[in-house]
């Protein structure tokens, strides 16, 4: 599920809810990106909070039990996003995702 992030009539980013596992797990993974010129304005934490509310609580949403956000350890901006929304750190997934030609750890 993909949503566009818009600011003053301009598309500035994207947020998605993927890897949705229904049934007994009821989990999903949130992913996002934002244009460099719009980073740091609070748009991404707002989008994450809105998507989380919809995915977890809204009767029209998938009514998930758990959401994950996976980031590369050195991505400080993404780390700030997850801190602002109150996400809990659970550890490192070693060689979790293939990014730019190499297997990368994610937190």
What does each of the following model-derived ranges do?
Residues 2-107:
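Acyl-donor (CoA/ACP) binding surface of acyl/acetyltransferases
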């Amino acid at each position: 599920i993909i949503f566009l992030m818009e600011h003053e009539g301009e598309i500035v980013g994207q947020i998605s809810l993927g890897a949705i596992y229904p049934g007994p797990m009821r989990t999903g993974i949130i992913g996002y990106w934002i244009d460099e010129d719009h980073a740091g304005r609070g748009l991404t934490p707002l989008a994450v909070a809105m998507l989380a509310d919809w995915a977890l609580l809204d009767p029209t949403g998938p009514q998930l039990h758990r959401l994950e956000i996976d980031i590369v350890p050195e991505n400080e901006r993404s780390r700030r996003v997850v801190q602002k929304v109150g996400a809990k750190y659970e550890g490192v997934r070693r060689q979790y995702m293939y990014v730019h030609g190499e297997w990368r750890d994610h937190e």
